[in-house]
Amino acid sequence: FFGSVLKLIPKIL
């Protein structure tokens, strides 16, 4: 789960 979130962070930024 967290692994996916960490990959989505750069997209949100």
UniProtKB/Swiss-Prot annotation:
Transmembrane annotation, as ranges: none
Leucine amide: modified positions: L13
A Gene Ontology cellular-component term: extracellular region
Main localization, broad class: secreted
One BP term from GO: defense response to bacterium
Keywords: Amidation, Amphibian defense peptide, Antibiotic, Antimicrobial, Secreted
Tissue expression from the record: Expressed by the skin glands.
Record bears the keyword Iron: no
Subcellular location(s) per record: Secreted
Family according to the record: Belongs to the frog skin active peptide (FSAP) family. Temporin subfamily.
Task of the protein: Has antibacterial activity against the Gram-positive bacterium S.aureus ATCC 25923 and the Gram-negative bacterium E.coli ATCC 25726.
Protein name per UniProt: Temporin-PTa
Species of the source: Pulchrana picturata (Malaysian fire frog)
